Amino acid sequence: MSFQPTPEDRFTFGLWTVGWQGRDPFGDATRPALDPVETVQRLAELGAYGVTFHDDDLIPFGSSDTERESHIKRFRQALDATGMTVPMATTNLFTHPVFKDGGFTANDRDVRRYALRKTIGNIDLAAELGAKTYVAWGGREGAESGGAKDVRDALDRMKEAFDLLGEYVTAQGYDLRFAIEPKPNEPRGDILLPTVGHALAFIERLERPELYGVNPEVGHEQMAGLNFPHGIAQALWAGKLFHIDLNGQSGIKYDQDLRFGAGDLRAAFWLVDLLETAGYEGPRHFDFKPPRTEDFDGVWASAAGCMRNYLILKDRAAAFRADPEVQEALRAARLDQLAQPTAADGLDALLADRAAFEDFDVDAAAARGMAFEHLDQLAMDHLLGARG
């Protein structure tokens, strides 16, 4: 298998990823700003399928209408020249100080109304550029202290905002769905809708739940100590995996945004295995930050590494699934039984079945090993290149 990416792999990057200048709470930028046009050109050369953007990534905050149109025109020309697409867009409701207490859930009503108008304006541009998904990350929607935010009221305002955006998209006839991106904390001390499970539950309360799904990010779920492939599996099970952000994270700490494959490599293996076998057809979107130690050569090497690592893991996962010994081990671990209904014969038959309870040999069942360790070692062998 070739590990050279092509547009058919559907790899995408945010302008803010390779464009991150390395500025953090403890240090200034280590790289100059990157022109979005150059980003499009370089990512196309690397084999990417598309780019994504926050409104302020493409059009600097405070630009005049004339300046705005100029930025859009240059960006569109770069897309046309390279064949790159814009599958997703989003709104920056976190950088400007006006959003210090959030956008959709700010206590200040005027700020909430401004946040909605800013979002609607970029939805128009997203639709114009052909985006099919609109991500919403509420990085400032939260609090640091208990009395600062009535969470029930804040969730009401969050629901109101998404319902209004759904109403707008429907009225305009846009072929666009929303993907909520959970995160437990950072930059706020505690962020609303902190995990995939919280977001899935919230979506069911919206007026048009069919328009809303999730955009889970590797590092965000792992910051909460959760199993990312399990969260993705539940989102797929619910039919709500509308988008995904791929990166690397090493345990419960700040949001590292490492290139994909760095950090928890085992989780990355199982994630790719899941995406490639579960029928996920969306972009494989990288939301990472090249370390501030790197110059631009390092930036592009990091971006290329994201795609290469995904393709290597895809190859390893396919070899794992095709291995006859693995298939035998899967049966020994009774995965085929898990796929069978527990009581397809119905409740009455279950209650009448003495073998299910009265005559069930609990001790014999308890003594049966599950053979999980052998199966897991086969996975490790494939991941580490010792098999296949």
From Swiss-Prot:
Active site: H54, D57
Subcellular location: Cytoplasm
Highest rank taxon of the organism: Bacteria
EC numbers: 5.3.1.5
Pfam families: AP_endonuc_2 (PF01261)
Cofactor entry: Mg(2+)
InterPro entries linked: Xyl_isomerase-like_sf, Xyl_isomerase-like_TIM-brl, XylA_actinobac, Xylose_isomerase
Stored SUPFAM superfamilies: Xylose isomerase-like
GO molecular function: magnesium ion binding; xylose isomerase activity
Family membership: Belongs to the xylose isomerase family.
UniProt subunit comment: Homotetramer.
Purpose of the protein: Involved in D-xylose catabolism.
NCBIfam families the record matches: xylA_Arthro
Designated name of the protein: Xylose isomerase
